[in-house]
Amino acid sequence: MEDGVYEPPDLTPEERMELENIRRRKQELLVEIQRLREELSEAMSEVEGLEANEGSKTLQRNRKMAMGRKKFNMDPKKGIQFLVEHELLQNTPEEIARFLYKGEGLNKTAIGDYLGEREELNLSVLHAFVDLHEFTDLNLVQALRQFLWSFRLPGEAQKIDRMMEAFAQRYCLCNPGVFQSTDTCYVLSFAVIMLNTSLHNPNVRDKPGLERFVAMNRGINEGGDLPEDLLRNLYDSIRNEPFKIPEDDGNDLTHTFFNPDREGWLLKLGGGRVKTWKRRWFILTDNCLYYFEYTTDKEPRGIIPLENLSIREVDDPRKPNCFELYIPNNKGQLIKACKTEADGRVVEGNHMVYRISAPTQEEKDEWIKSIQAAVSVDPFYEMLAARKKRISVKKKQEQP
């Protein structure tokens, strides 16, 4: 026994050497463990120091700013209110507009919704936001590209009208003499947006040529015609490069469902031979009705475009609170829709009508109201017709 450590007397020299090596290695490990303990203690002290620093005003401000952006993306009005209450944003149209224009971490759909509201503050922010855009010496398409990239244009007609009116005023202020009035700029802007859709939407088969585009815009310059070279340049620019529409999420459909017109659980009657009711999560947005198996699904099980469809209440002996989507004056054709099968294949729908049951009478009425609003006439065409009529009336009033 040596230093209180037991050592068997009958060990061979080789075994004694092995035992000595083990003891030495044990001592080295004990030293290493102690060193690691000291390093861990230092690291814990550093972590505690970092946690203490997180209590600093700068980090607290950054955290609250991130929280405010998140709130804005979910509810723009509440997000702005949160930032103002925490003194992260001044409650002035100019400061709010600058915050939206910079757009750091902001959802462009939410920006568009906020700018389109009719409240006095929102209207002032809209004009301050538009004033941050520099359109001097840009042709109309170039200016529209810049403007429409800074937010996502909302779907409501009145919101679009206010935003495009503000754009037309700003463009004419930056480029005096190009158009005789803001009405002309407004009408031509819509004509360009619709041209972009017609030329680049694969569902539009009848692509307008230059001559038709020129003919569409005759007489809009206070009764006179715009220079054909101007219209040709605008047409060529759109034909060669479509507008880039902001998408707040890159690779899936999530952005489509960010701010729906309506969403909720409904029962849908199947279109197969055996008619069964299935519970689905429905989302109404962008003039389409999407349905999912679960609220957490990123991809819908089915898509029902609402174009050319109507809606009506129906009685069903099996389910209460029913309504139907149908084609008016239908002569046996199926509704244009698609669904995803269990094996992932996308197939055409098999419905002449879609019968749906809501949980309550109140929810049924709300769904019918929302869907009726979604299947209304294209707001672009309504507003364009109204503005052209205004130009025509103004011209007649000016005639002796």
From Swiss-Prot:
Record GO cellular component, one term: cytoplasm
Region (C-terminal autoinhibitory region): 387-395
Domain named SEC7: residues: 72-201
Cysteine pairings via disulfide bonds: none
Function comment: Acts as a guanine-nucleotide exchange factor (GEF). Promotes guanine-nucleotide exchange on ARF1, ARF3 and ARF6. Activates ARF factors through replacement of GDP with GTP. The cell membrane form, in association with ARL4 proteins, recruits ARF6 to the plasma membrane. Involved in neurite growth.
Coiled coil: 10-67
Transmembrane segments: none
GO biological process, one term: regulation of cell adhesion
Listed result of changing residue 280 to A: Abolishes phosphatidylinositol 3,4,5-trisphosphate binding
Domain PH: 259-376
Compartment list: Cell membrane; Cytoplasm; Cell projection; Cell projection, Growth cone
Gene source species: Mus musculus (Mouse)
Assembly notes: Heteromer. Composed of TAMALIN, CYTH2 and at least one GRM1. Interacts with ARRB1. Interacts with ARL4D; the interaction is direct. Directly interacts with CCDC120 through the coiled coil domain; this interaction stabilizes CCDC120, possibly by preventing its ubiquitination, and is required for neurite growth in a neuroblastoma cell line. Interacts with FRMD4A. Interacts (via N-terminal domain) with INAVA (via N-terminal domain).
Protein name as catalogued: Cytohesin-2
Gene Ontology MF terms in the entry: guanyl-nucleotide exchange factor activity; inositol 1,4,5 trisphosphate binding; lipid binding
Domain-related comment: Binds via its PH domain to the inositol head group of phosphatidylinositol 3,4,5-trisphosphate. The PH domain is necessary and sufficient for plasma membrane relocalization. Autoinhibited by its C-terminal basic region.
Gene from which the chain derives: Cyth2
Keyword annotations: Cell junction, Cell membrane, Cell projection, Coiled coil, Cytoplasm, Guanine-nucleotide releasing factor, Lipid-binding, Membrane, Tight junction
Positions contributing to a 1,2-diacyl-sn-glycero-3-phospho-(1D-myo-inositol-3,4,5-trisphosphate) binding: 268-276, 280, 291, 301, 339, 350-351
